[in-house]
């Protein structure tokens, strides 16, 4: 299990992309990754499962792809 808390915080976009590539490589080895991340689009794009928390409670869950495609998520969290 690898726990990552905001690995993109404060980094330039080029470094963020590299960090997420590394996270994907770690996933491919079979390591479970628990990622807490404010960059929702990046996090959801590599997630098998995703949870949206509001004030400490799970308000939405699904696959990363399901949440990326969700109108509710687009409007509330992804600026869509």
Enumerate the language-model features and the residues they cover.
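Catalytic Walker B motif of ABC-type/P-loop ATPase nucleotide-binding domains
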Residues: 2-6
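Short coil-to-helix N-cap segments within the nucleotide-binding domains
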Residues: 10-11, 26
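Helical segment within the ABC ATPase nucleotide-binding domain
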Residues: 16-29
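H-loop/switch region of ABC-family ATPase nucleotide-binding domains
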Residues: 37-38
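A short, surface-exposed alpha-helical micro-motif characterized by mixed small hydrophobic
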Residues: 43-45
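Short, glycine/charged-rich "phosphate-handling" switch motifs in NTP-dependent
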Residues: 49, 61
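Short acidic-hydrophobic catalytic motif
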Residues: 65-69
């Amino acid at each position: 299990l690898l726990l990552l808390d905001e690995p993109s915080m404060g980094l330039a976009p080029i470094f963020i992309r590299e960090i997420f590539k590394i996270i994907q490589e770690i996933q491919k080895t079979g390591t479970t990754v628990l990622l807490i991340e404010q960059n929702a689009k990046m996090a959801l794009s590599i997630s098998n499962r995703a949870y949206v928390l509001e004030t400490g409670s799970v308000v939405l869950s699904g696959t990363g792809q399901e949440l990326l495609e969700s109108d509710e998520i687009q409007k509330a969290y992804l600026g869509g």
